[in-house]
Amino acid sequence: MANVAIVGAQWGDEGKGKVVDIYTEYADDIVRFQGGNNAGHTLVVGNEKVVLHLIPSGILHEGKRCIIGNGVVLDPEVFIKEIVKLKESGRLTDDSCLLLSESLHIIMPYHKRIDIAREARSGDRKIGTTGRGIGPCYEDKIGRRGIRLMDLLNRDVFARRLKEFLVEKNFLLEKMLGEAPCDYDQILEEYSGYAEVLRAYMADTALIINNDLQAGKKILFEGAQGTLLDVDFGTYPFVTSSSTCAGGVCTGSGVGPRHIHEIIGISKAYVTRVGSGPFPTELFDADGDRLRDAGGEFGSTTGRPRRCGWFDAMVIRYAVRTNGLTGIALTKLDVLSGFDSIKICTGYTLDGKALETLPSAPEAFENCQPVYEELPGWNADISGAKSFEELPDSARAYVKRLEELAGCPIVLVSVGARRDQTIILRNPFL
């Protein structure tokens, strides 16, 4: 028996959705434990592309229980739209296979309004927020001013808490951000309508997950964003507002750490980042444009073009250490086909001195200079490779070198967007 956590090993957008989709076959429950609809998973099933922002990727498999845990912040409108779309396509036929934690926090209209207004006033200090209200919702959770799902489903409690909190939120919007206030009656009616839909999905998910663990079922924990966006261990302040690392599994789902047997970090064969913040290997030349175009590097949530750069072994070693990774799933190796040579960042220098790890201060991180080694590329189309041995010699050498630099075994190699374009070297569930 194995329970597996999936986390991003870079700055998000590493291809977690595809890997989760593959591993779902071996799991009974798929659990999201942090984040909100600021992340998007893009899955290609046959010739169909499916983009999910809240509902776990496992929903595309019949007979699997998908759980959105207490560590997630939920936009009811987005969740309901995803449900409707899945039902219309015949992919959600049993509501009992999708559960929401009664303790998760609800994103309110004022969270989104505040998020957008703050970013607009930030000038050249923009974080790069998606404007979905994620950060302000987590602020209220920590400040004990949040509205949980269980509160939303009790109209009297919801009305009282909304009225209390809206006084402060409207003061902030009007007096400090120069925005129009939110309307109490409008929010009350709109969200009371959402509550009736959400009621069918609410449960004590921590209890359910632990009961399933006791029964010997296999759990797959699905992370969002990436290690370098973690609120504590990421490139602060250019981070998200939740714990994206493996430690967030426990607090975001209600399970103890002894139940997590494998932690798989997802990494592209190069690096991308959306929004502001340090990125030592970022490319501003034709190679960067080529990676962006070949990899389709545009955000599934925002549509923004992603910043692209060469593989950064410093980042991956940091992710291995911070998460305790037991394996790495390497995605988008096929995007590198056609490059005459490929660079790998093996270390950084700062003011002429070699660094042992990533600097904590963003100002120092911004000034880091990457140290590169160069490997020969390959011209063959590898998207049809079914085994590691079928890859060109230089592609195999590249993967092996990344594994050496990471200090962690590569357990999966993705050579295309489809499920069947995957080489599994070791299955963490078996």
UniProtKB/Swiss-Prot annotation:
- State the source organism's domain of life: Bacteria
Q: Cite a GO CC annotation.
A: cytoplasm
Report the Pfam families cross-referenced here: Adenylsucc_synt
What Enzyme Commission number(s) appear in the record? 6.3.4.4
Binding residues annotated for substrate, in chain numbering: 300-306
Binding of IMP occurs at 13-16, 38-41, 130, 144, 225, 240, 304
Q: Which residues bind GTP?
A: 12-18, 40-42, 306, 332-334, 414-416
Where in or outside the cell it occurs: the entry states: Cytoplasm
Q: InterPro entries under this entry?
A: Adenylosuccin_syn_GTP-bd, Adenylosuccin_syn_Lys_AS, Adenylosuccinate_synth_dom1, Adenylosuccinate_synth_dom2, Adenylosuccinate_synth_dom3, Adenylosuccinate_synthetase, P-loop_NTPase
Q: In which pathway does it act?
A: Purine metabolism; AMP biosynthesis via de novo pathway; AMP from IMP: step 1/2
Q: Where does Mg(2+) bind?
A: 13, 40
Q: How is the cofactor bound?
A: Binds 1 Mg(2+) ion per subunit.
The entry assigns this protein to a family as follows: Belongs to the adenylosuccinate synthetase family.
HAMAP family from the entry?
Adenylosucc_synth
Protein name (Swiss-Prot/TrEMBL): Adenylosuccinate synthetase
Q: Which gene encodes it?
A: purA
